[in-house]
Amino acid sequence: MNEVIILGREQFINKVLPKVDEVKNTFFISILEPDDDFENLHEDTENFKTWKFYDIEYDINNYKAITFEQAKEIYEFIKKNEGKNLICHCYAGVARSGAVGEFYWEMLGG
């Protein structure tokens, strides 16, 4: 049985990030705010990928929601890693990462 773990950013940074390169049969999705002070938490690899978009449904002035292209990239990354465990985080560990985790869980037959 595959695990889908959803975390907030601080939990991810403190508990998961130091062990990312050691974990087997797992892939990681990092969702950051576009104006975060850091570029990425980890370099993108076959098992780790970062996207940046705000937790909003549609663009509001300079605040950008997820784009169709980003959604497609996330889907393709998930398909490439299908069958592995997923650890996904966003700032609070609720909406964006929760939606990605729910999608993967349903894809696996949830």
Stretches found by the model and what they are:
Residues 32, 54, 91:
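Anionic group-transfer/hydrolysis microenvironments
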